[in-house]
């Protein structure tokens, strides 16, 4: 199924105060100045993510649209939302962000040059932009000159969905449009939703290229043997 480029990258042109690809040091200063974070011993930033200290799977929906409908295993985890509701929510979320400072970060998801994808993240907070720098891979200077995002993330934690109007489970909402390769996040400050959304699109796309995505870590023994460790988050894969 071919993907269509998200129209969200042009959002930056419509916003008044847009901070594009700031350095970590500048973002650090902005996070402190704006009261988003405090400095802990030895200098790391500490933030509070409110009521959401982890992902909120019950608030996540995939857009049920023609381009991806037959390729999704619909059910309890992959829950559908109509394209009409998505468009209405998207318009309100974009309008919400247009009234705020927005931090824009261009990154790559994946290390392999043949399989990585480019992502542009629009975040409401400076610290979330640092999160993107740390979690994803930053382009080199030469790559920035020709950077074009394959998919887009819009992270608006202060946005609130209206369940009766929007068909959501709560005021928190995470929407993924697989054909447009857009991820919209509202009502949660937990930055891991950006990671999971990006990985979800990669997991959807890469099998068509003959690549098996795995939630795993790999270790190589002295004799060159390879061991793959599978497990849920926090089960010690990286430690092993």
Residue ranges, per PLM feature:
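Glycine-rich phosphate-binding P-loop
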Residues: 220-240
